[in-house]
Amino acid sequence: MATTATPATNQGWPEDFGFRLGGSGPCFVLEVAKGSSAHAGGLRPGDQILEVEGLAVGGLSRERLVRLARRCPRVPPSLGVLPAPDGGPGPGSGPAAPTTVLRAPRCGRGLALGRELLRLAGRKRPDAVHRERRRKAQEFSRKVDEILGDQPTAKEQVFAALKQFAAEQRVDDLVWTLTLALPREACGPLLDNLRIFIPKKHRARFDEVVSQGLLGKLCRARRAQGAQRLRRSRSEERPERLLVSTRASAPPRRPDEPPPRRASLLVGGLAGPGGARRTVRVYKGNKSFGFTLRGHGPVWIESVLPGSPADNAALKSGDRILFLNGLDMRNCSHDKVVSMLQGSGAMPTLVVEEGLVPFASDSDSLDSPNPSSALTSLQWVAEILPSSIRVQGRTFSQQLEHLLTPPERYGVCRALESFFQHRNIDTLIVDVYPVLDTPAKQVLWQFIYQLLTYEEQELCQEKIACFLGYTAMTAEPEPELDLESEPTPEPQPRSSLRASSMCRRSLRSQGLEAGLSCGPSECPEMPLPLIPGERQAGDGTSLPETPNPKMMSAVYAELESRLNSSFKGKMGTVSKSRASPPGPSPAVTTGPRTLSGVSWPSERLLPSPCYHPLCSGGLASPSSSESHPYASLDSSRAPSPQPGPGPICPDSPPSPDPTRPPSRRKLFTFSHPVRSRDTDRFLDVLSEQLGPRVTIVDDFLTPENDYEEMSFHDDQGSFVTNERSSASDCISSSEEGSSLTYSSISDHIPPPPLSPPPPPPLPFHDAKPSSRSSDGSRGPAQALAKPLTQLSHPVPPPPPPPLPPPVPCAPPMLSRGLGHRRSETSHMSVKRLRWEQVENSEGTIWGQLGEDSDYDKLSDMVKYLDLELHFGTQKPAKPVPGPEPFRKKEVVEILSHKKAYNTSILLAHLKLSPAELRQVLMSMEPRRLEPAHLAQLLLFAPDADEEQRYQAFREAPGRLSEPDQFVLQMLSVPEYKTRLRSLHFQATLQEKTEEIRGSLECLRQASLELKNSRKLAKILEFVLAMGNYLNDGQPKTNKTTGFKINFLTELNSTKTVDGKSTFLHILAKSLSQHFPELLGFAQDLPTVPLAAKVNQRALTSDLADLHGTISEIQDACQSISPSSEDKFAMVMSSFLETAQPALRALDGLQREAMEELGKALAFFGEDSKATTSEAFFGIFAEFMSKFERALSDLQAGEGLRSSGMVSPLAW
């Protein structure tokens, strides 16, 4: 049978070649004409077309496949087919039964209908593997739909976890998230089907996590999470952290009342984080969305037109628009959302939330069977800030994961999400503040501030500053006393919260709760007990110095009650062993301990001889070792000591003159923080602002930390308060962890109030060192004392007396070792050890020190080691210099100071005397001096003015300085500078000529490569064709025949419609499909990137300098007469004879390079006079670099698709 002749082109493919195609991806051969070229090539009906010219076309429709084959340069194009089974597709539009039975031996080899060909002739079929994995992914998606069909939130979490795993490749996180989202009975089957999507390098870890029972542990941890919070170092977790508090305007509720339910009513229905969120892409093209919007902040969809793009995207009435193309739309007005939607492009992406979802309280969520599954749905809150905002090198989401446990992260994200709806600062502080209970966690406040408006930032800072800025109110003076009022402290700036210690876990006594719950008329009669470290709870509007019970915010009262209830159980047993000197108080009259009351401004304060910081109800402040503001700036005045019910202490100072203001003593106690630059800057700034009124004394050491006391003295001296502490305080303090305090250079330190000049300080009478204060606060009284020896020798508390005895000002017992301490005024400051403290010493070697009685002996021993002499910071007195025995010799200096200094250094490096250097210059021996030394001698040579001054110098040379003597001797050499330049030129000529020759050769070779590159010319032709196609229909109807080559650097600036790629990506993709041989065009241009770095002007200038130096040397050879001593003319003439041929060769190479460069510029249509070589070659170098990067992006995308990593969005 005769064979039909093969056509000359592919324009009639496939009919001209004797076969027909059908199908819509993949395509099948429907019919093959006998005797045609297709029949002769082995093509049979039913064959599936998989490849055309090596390109995978299994997913292309018939029209696209035909278009691709007709553009192939080879005639006919090579095809890769999958042989048909026993039957082929019929003449329908899609795959059908085959018309012919071919290749029956396959059945005998085990091939059956429906099998997928994965390997053909020893080669893997990536597209077949890809389809196999895609089918398994679809099966997995169907199983998820079957199990989680009624749980859309859990289903969304599963796919979000898979998408996150595809990006981060973390198996443990994947298993953790799936465990939280999936029911326990569904974990096993779904994880088995999920294993195929795990890369091989991670499957071992995946199997280990599943097989070794870690999955069961995660399930158990999830079930127990609602009942017991994870314990973190240095903080007691409180289960009520996640409970939603009442608003600031709500009245305080009793502890036995259940927490109220919150509801936030929006226009579109009830809003809440419980609504199911989903991401929707609307393919609208040039059409409208097809929905109507209502409301604002956020807007919601009122109605959707049937058949519209919104209806096709499954949007429905009641959906609220939260994000548009990644932009937050939740707080935008209606008009702004409409304008943003109009400019959102052809395929905008929306994040919507279903409407009509009840807003459940946090307590309900804790009792739900799957409380932690909401953590993944709240992940968008952690990722709302851009990754460019970082603190300590981490983003917001990274800091949340690094600092907080999963329940804590849930609480913070849930609080922020709720805040976005109600915008209530008080509720945000109450919800977030108990979680951020350590200095390390308080870094998160800097991120939270980024989510607030400027007004909300200022309000939040005022609220927190008032809430944290406790000032002990021991007395409020009567108006008739006419006392001098204290200035109001300035509010902290915005950045002051960045590093201040916010941990204020204080205990609120029953008196405070009673004062908050009482009516306005009862409050003046109810004294307010204070404990160390407690602050007045204000609403942010009243000053902390004058608390008003009518303006107390219930939000902060509730927060105080939370913190109070969380510590009663823990500290109850510890407080029983604490003994403190009781004192008289009108508030409480029974019990071994007396409560000191703080009266309201309308109440007269009862005088007392001494002042003690007392604990409420016998409870020790748990924050004594954790919370710490740097300074407690007490603005209240201490009342003068007057005779009271008890005897007057013998050591107390006499009462001051009633006509003068009562004396006071301000005590600033600083807990020694961890070593950091911020800490040092804080102390420096504080010392500068406080000036001479502050005295920094490293006075003593406690088992936990060292302190610095800063004390102010009035004319009347100071009052010292002491309290005996038991060993239980030290133990409880060490268990709580060391105080981590931070400061910032931007923190504002208010200056101290004006006071009379300080008199000579009074010595302390048997004063004990202050312990670590609760919240760093001090009233006029001295802080609690903790002797070192009480760690191992606790003092049992005395039995409670029937009536409180008088309080002595100085306890009779003194800790051993501390009694021998010098007075604080004469104590020498010592250097501090910059160590980092162990946060939790329990179970370590440091936790065992308290059990060893030898530690007390060591603590006493170090007091006698004279450490102050070795590490004292006081500078020794400088000895008075005696009279000079001889007057300094006066010298004459002519050189500038800089030149003289550098000349002295150079003489030390030369290792040549001036006479030897003169001999070198006269004999012109280049080997005796290095080129660098010659260049320095030229640089430091005298200028014309200095040469005239040397010539006018008529005195003895010995009166000159050493550099001037050297220069004076060098100037006696004829043509001193010319000789130096000649020697330097002779030493560096070879290096310069090689450098210039290489640059010129690079320009010449790069010009030739650009002119002769056919691949580059083909690419430019392809770009021209693409541009003319895009510009067709523009006002200029004539097609462009050429373009300026600088357009090549702008190809990546033209974006595609979806914004994901550029014109350069499309160019690279098209070349890889149609002209793959052109992809390596950069290999034809290896010299072009090097030529782009050559500066043509500098090159021309260097050549001109060489010619100028040679002319100068020639003139010097004629002017300097040769002699037996001076060999300049003879040496340099001989040198010029060998140097001039090399320069002539350079001149010829320069002419040739410039000629080739001009031809290349003209070849590409550029002006040779206006275009420099570096600009010309730089265009092509930049195009090559960008093209390689675009090609790498395409290949990386192809690699991900061929490796089977199917995105969950494609399912």
Swiss-Prot record:
Biased amino acid composition, Acidic residues: 478-487
UniProt cross-references to Gene3D superfamilies, sorted A to Z: 1.20.1160.20, 2.30.42.10, Formin, FH2 domain (1.20.58.2220)
A GO cellular component annotation in the UniProt record: cerebellar granule cell to Purkinje cell synapse
Pro residues bias locations: 640-661, 749-763
InterPro entries: FH2_Formin, FH2_Formin_sf, Formin_Homology, PDZ, PDZ_sf
Biased composition (Polar residues): 587-599
Main localization of the protein described in the UniProt heading: membrane
Keyword line: Cell membrane, Membrane, Phosphoprotein, Postsynaptic cell membrane, Repeat, Synapse
GO BP terms: long-term synaptic depression; regulation of postsynaptic cytosolic calcium ion concentration; regulation of postsynaptic membrane neurotransmitter receptor levels
Modification type Phosphoserine: residues: 580, 621, 652, 655
SMART domains to which the protein is assigned, alphabetical: FH2 (SM00498), PDZ (SM00228)
First and last residue of the signal peptide: none
FH2 domain boundaries: 820-1211
Claim: Repeat is one of the keywords in the record: yes
Cellular compartments annotated: Postsynaptic cell membrane
Domain PDZ: 3-84, 279-356
Biased composition (Low complexity): 242-251, 618-639, 725-746, 770-781
CDD domains tied to this protein: HN_L-delphilin-R1_like, HN_L-delphilin-R2_like, PDZ1_L-delphilin-like, PDZ2_L-delphilin-like
Region Disordered, residue ranges: 226-269, 478-502, 525-549, 568-600, 618-672, 718-783
Assembly notes: Interacts with C-terminus of the glutamate receptor GRID2 via PDZ domain.
Free-text function comment from the UniProt entry: Postsynaptic scaffolding protein at the parallel fiber-Purkinje cell synapse, where it may serve to link GRID2 with actin cytoskeleton and various signaling molecules.
This protein's name: Delphilin
Source organism (scientific name): Homo sapiens
Gene coding for it: GRID2IP
